[in-house]
């Protein structure tokens, strides 16, 4: 809980703003060697608490406030759950125009319950309307990823 509280404060308080795709590497430098697909990660997460992995995936959305988180989705299965990604020690942020691009990231996948307060904060960061945000009334168990490094592939 302390980690997520810190993340809420960090997202709102950092002055650095990230936009544009001029950089390819963020955080720990990584490449595609040994990476598994997001769909393979979903299979690997069945029945376990966490997995250290290098994963490729499609970015579906990015924090529009600072770039302090992104969502990853399956390229093949549009019904698959989305994975919420944050960045180790808030040492880097993603470009705010990264949605629709493919990335490879290294770090740890895990499941965690996200509070209503945090869900509303992230919905606000994403630019959802007040009416959409008000519909958030229950905590949600989510697949999350703490990335130590990200590389933009396209």
Indicate residue ranges for each PLM-predicted region.
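OB-fold and OB-like single-stranded nucleic-acid-recognition modules
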Residues: 11-154
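Sec-dependent bacterial lipoprotein signal peptides
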Residues: 1-9
